[in-house]
Amino acid sequence: MDKWFDAMIDDIKVYLPQVDRDRLLSAYTLSETIYKDRIKNEKYNNFIFRPRDVVKNLISLKPDEDTVVAAFLYDLLDSGRLYLREIEEEYGEGVVSLLEGLQILKSIMVVRYQSTDKLDLLRKLFLVMAKDIRVLVIFLSVKVIQMDLLEDIPSDCSEAFATEVLEIFVPIAARLGIYRYKMILEDKGFKILHPDDYKKIHTQVGELVKKKNDYVDSVSKILADFYSDHGFGDVKVSGRLKGYYSIHNKMKKKGLPLLYKKESHSH
């Protein structure tokens, strides 16, 4: 048996005990077969992503069964070996509806405008066109995976892609409240567009992480104890470090140099 698939099913069963294992196995097997064939036979395969990586990204968001199936099959439509009619017969109308929404988003040629108003209009267009929020969640998960593949494509293309992600998809992730994707996309885009600044902040934050985590854990415990003492025993308190891009922007707004140690402590 496939260990990756078995682990995924175990994760899904935690929140969706009635999941149809055979249905997901069928979609997974199909996606792996076509993915491996594309990698082997397509000349320009640097930007082909593995569908199961998209699914792995999604699991923490507790997607339903149709969403998982659609995530497995989404990029396979480009192979020309899979058609919506066949997918509907095998997996149902719900999956086809998600895939059609993803195809619409994928077909949009995103143009990076200078005008903030035009950018906002484009973001709204994405939100209007994706009437099912699950479509955007899958699409954002794909963007996270694609950002990892940018090192293997020419720098002018990777910079254009990273700029598009920061201008369009990061705000969408924020509007949907998916802050994990927001921070990942911001930091990956920042690394591509401003590698030197990224390296400085990465080094600086790395020196402070242990001290910062100890402080966050200490304060979290104090707050948790406080709530518990006042009858709120189920309250969970946690903290996190800011993303590199967020630190960069805050320091920029304050006019502070990147190597200003004191400011890093404030994050």
Q: What are the residue ranges of the model-derived segments?
A:
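Alpha-helical scaffolds flanking conserved acidic
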Residues: 49, 53, 64-73, 94-98, ...
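Conserved structural-core and active-site-/substrate-pathway-adjacent residues in large, well-folded domains
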Residues: 31, 71-74, 99, 142, ...
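Short, mixed-charge amphipathic alpha-helical segments
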Residues: 12-27, 84-94
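Hydrophobic or amphipathic alpha-helical targeting/insertion segments
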Residues: 73-107
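Nucleic-acid processing machinery
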Residues: 1-16, 33-40, 48-60, 79, ...
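Short, well-structured alpha-helical segments
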Residues: 21-32, 48, 96-103, 186
